[in-house]
């Protein structure tokens, strides 16, 4: 029992630290010397990076943040042994990486909105669901020109898609 608790704690800590890597902050600081938290919306995420550096860097930060979201979940799926049938360890990793992205220990607990990291976690939990969610997000965002609208709609449908594709119950609960 102690080993299982320690394993889940290790999953959470590692995922949180990976999630805390402030991708947008690092890129904007390297390119302009600015602290992205002092411009635009104050968020360190891809949308605010787009305001400062343009569309190419928006896509770069989206990709890096999605990879940052996926990595801890993939590691948990490969190496964690606790609650395999329920999908518990990968979901703990997903939650921790989202918390890390939005409340980075490296930025005095400030961060991004966790949209790209969230998509990365869903892609890693179930890549088919992740692709459907990413497609919905892209179409809605392109159509409305609002990242937030695309994000909300995509995330609202994610638990239903996860459920209908027979994913572990913890994955469905995570998306809900």
For each feature predicted by the language model, list its residue ranges.
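Helix-coil boundary and interhelical linker segments in multi-pass alpha-helical membrane proteins
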Residues: 1-11, 73-92, 123-129, 163-174
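Alpha-helical transmembrane segments in multi-pass membrane proteins
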Residues: 7, 11, 15, 20, ...
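C-terminal ends of transmembrane helices
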Residues: 24-27, 100-110, 137-144
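Cytosolic, membrane-interface loops and tails of multi-pass inner-membrane proteins
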Residues: 25-58, 111
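Short, non-helical or kinked segments that cap or interrupt transmembrane helices
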Residues: 34-45, 106-119, 146-154
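Generic transmembrane alpha-helix signature in multi-pass membrane proteins
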Residues: 47-50, 58-61, 71-77, 104-108, ...
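Interfacial segments of multi-pass membrane proteins
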Residues: 50-53, 76-80, 96, 114-144, ...
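Loop-to-transmembrane alpha-helix initiation sites
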Residues: 131, 147-155, 166-176
